[in-house]
């Protein structure tokens, strides 16, 4: 018998429950002990008479297809992994899994159906290179991780209102997603998915961390607050419109978005950590941050911009580096800001294509020259492939090779000019 001993106990419990109550056709609960493993459909059939199973169920081995019938709740986790012959799986009666739903290393699995599933703690879908269909009726989940799959859609998560972690990475055929999420208490990450990925999070009001890479279009129509860090790195976005956003609690990073020509953050007043705009080659006019008043770390703006409007800026707790290759850019307004004591860090640098001003704020020396006296935070936009942080038990593998594939590291707020340089360097590694 291929099912572990726990299944024998389950069958006995089921028979006993039926004998004790002849009016009940399905026992309310069947215990499989701490855990049990099924390697054949016959093993799963042994618990088909249960509406609830208690314990962790693992499905593995040489199954061509598999199904869990009648079971409505798993008081534990369901893991399906390392089956080279499993092509389809269905459990359309399950409404609730109190633990995790793990699907990993299923190389020919094309479909997984959980049509009634509304509640689960976490879903981890990792290394599913053939899957095209995944369905749920999901309403509540804490963590969602989808990595290294061939899914074209993740609509099975489209009705979720809140999560802790939402991490979608290295899914080369995934080109669009429209979400109903209203809050993300830990992190929202999209990276290394299909070409021209389009995302819409128009109901999202609050998030702790957001990092987007390799995205072509994004909509945040209602986003008001990011409690920690917000990063847009190596995207093909033509524009960024976050006109409802008023506060970023830690760092704000807009780095190496080669097609970005407009950034509108018209209600943003506070950046609690480092503020970085770097290497966005088409961003010639930076006028969407004109209401920013305070920056709690250092500020770094580098590129080919002719206009930079920071007209409301009153305080920068760290250093400041402004470096434009355009000779049309004027440092006058920024030099006035520095002379009024608004820059509180250890240095102030402002350069355009013709002149340079560098001030060490810890001393009284001022240097002006026509040559570049201070190195900028410029770097190439190419980043190495990297695995996303999917979970302690499952690591993603990259399934695509286009520019800068990999999840962004969390950017630590800089408190000095050199801190900003280090933060940009980390982002581009």
UniProtKB/Swiss-Prot annotation:
InterPro entries: CWI-Assembly_Regulator, Rcpt_L-dom_sf. It is a lipid-anchor; GPI-anchor. Gene3D superfamilies: Receptor L-domain (3.80.20.20). A lipid is attached at residue 406 (GPI-anchor amidated glycine). Keywords: Cell membrane, Cell wall, Cell wall biogenesis/degradation, Glycoprotein, GPI-anchor, Lipoprotein, Membrane, Phosphoprotein, Secreted, Signal. Residues 361-410 are annotated as: Disordered. Residues 407-429 form a propeptide. The GPI-anchor is attached to the protein in the endoplasmic reticulum and serves to target the protein to the cell surface. There, the glucosamine-inositol phospholipid moiety is cleaved off and the GPI-modified mannoprotein is covalently attached via its lipidless GPI glycan remnant to the 1,6-beta-glucan of the outer cell wall layer. One of its GO terms (cellular component) is endoplasmic reticulum. Residues 361-401 have a biased composition (Low complexity). Residues 1-19 form the signal peptide. It is found in: Cell membrane; Secreted, Cell wall. One of its GO terms (biological process) is fungal-type cell wall organization. Glycans are attached at residues 21, 56, 82, 196, 209, 227, 234, 241, 267, 279, 304, 328, 389. The keyword Glycoprotein applies. Belongs to the SPS2 family. Present with 6500 wall-bound molecules/cell in log phase YPD medium. PANTHER family: RECEPTOR PROTEIN-TYROSINE KINASE (PTHR31018:SF3), SPORULATION-SPECIFIC PROTEIN-RELATED (PTHR31018). This is Cell wall protein ECM33. It comes from Saccharomyces cerevisiae (strain ATCC 204508 / S288c) (Baker's yeast). The gene is ECM33.
